[in-house]
Amino acid sequence: MLTRLKAKSEGKLAKQLCRVVLDQFDKQYSKELGDSWSTVRDVLISPSLWQYAILFNRFNYPFELEKALHLRGYHTVLQGALPHYPKSMKCYLSRTPDRMPSERHQTGSLKKYYLLNAASLLPVLALELRDGEAVLDLCAAPGGKSVALLQCAYPGYLLCNEYDRPRGRWLRQTLESFIPQPLINVIKVSELDGREMGDAQPATFDKVLVDAPCSNDRSWLFSSDSQKAAYRIHQRKNLPVLQVELVRSAIKALRPGGLLVYSTCTLSKAENQDVISEVLTSDSNIVPVDISGIARTFSQDFTFAPTDQKCSLLVIPEKGKAWGPMYIAKLKKGMSTRKRQGEFCKPC
């Protein structure tokens, strides 16, 4: 079965590298990552080295596929290694480059699996979702992290927000493809500008995920339109402003004591550590949460860049562990406006 499915996906990895973007990344990331950049670069510019994880849908479990994956040497992301690791979430990885085709959307039929970069699961795990909680996925399209959240627990309410209308349609289709009707009833999809969410729904959610718009390194490196790519690079400096505004809006939407996870799929310090440092510096009611235990737990499957921010992690790809880039930071909204103790997360 797996061989047949894999054959259908061959030929999809032929991509054309965008020199404009690569030159910019070479200039920036050689400074920010130092010697690590050459290793990361080798993976990012070589799609044949990329790996894809297979997240099972617990609402239509693929038992036959699971047997086939075991025979091919796939293994699960370390289940039970974290105190809050959800037993209901099952994701398989291969240590060698391999890709199955995505399943087609069929109205009324649930898909059995979702393909994703395995590092995308880390923000979901960091959120520590529990049954009955009110959850906001602020920038939810295309829906992979929303699907992953629903593999972890049964929220009392899940708001999946996506401001971009075409991406919002993609999000709705993804949810319809993976989530059964009874659970769909506790999910709402909105198209609000994420910067306005805090004012629209103040102090509403127990958990908020901000998977922010960013300079998606993998995607940008293979931009087909060089002029559009050059424009993106020029406009890139504006992204941190948007990202900070999204995080501040998400904080407003959090209940006191609520948790926020911020994530991007870029290596950019300006869009990662600097965003979190700006938020922590400007808001005394936000407490950084130590997530260094995630790096220790998942070091066999992921490579993490060195950091002095214990509230954040940066997954960097290397051969055999071609996951990422993925930046994750975790914050907690205080119960009052008293001055926070900044022992966990130092502004960079």
From Swiss-Prot:
Record has Nucleotide-binding as a keyword: no
Entry's EC annotation: 2.1.1.-
One GO term describing the cellular component: mitochondrial matrix
Residues spanning the membrane: none
Gene3D superfamilies the UniProt entry points to: 6.20.240.40, Vaccinia Virus protein VP39
Binding site for S-adenosyl-L-methionine: 139-145, 162, 193, 211
GO biological process, one term: regulation of mitochondrial translation
Keywords, alphabetical: Methyltransferase, Mitochondrion, RNA-binding, S-adenosyl-L-methionine, Transferase, tRNA-binding
Reactions catalysed, as given in the entry: cytidine(34) in mitochondrial tRNA + S-adenosyl-L-methionine = 5-methylcytidine(34) in mitochondrial tRNA + S-adenosyl-L-homocysteine + H(+)
Catalytic residues (positions): 265 (nucleophile)
Disulfide bonds: none
Pfam family, one: Methyltr_RsmB-F
Record's keyword annotation contains Transmembrane: no
Main location: mitochondrion
Domain of life: Eukaryota
Compartmental location: Mitochondrion matrix
Family: Belongs to the class I-like SAM-binding methyltransferase superfamily. RsmB/NOP family.
Function: Mitochondrial tRNA methyltransferase that mediates methylation of cytosine to 5-methylcytosine (m5C) at position 34 of mt-tRNA(Met). mt-tRNA(Met) methylation at cytosine(34) takes place at the wobble position of the anticodon and initiates the formation of 5-formylcytosine (f(5)c) at this position. mt-tRNA(Met) containing the f(5)c modification at the wobble position enables recognition of the AUA codon in addition to the AUG codon, expanding codon recognition in mitochondrial translation.
Protein name: tRNA (cytosine(34)-C(5))-methyltransferase, mitochondrial
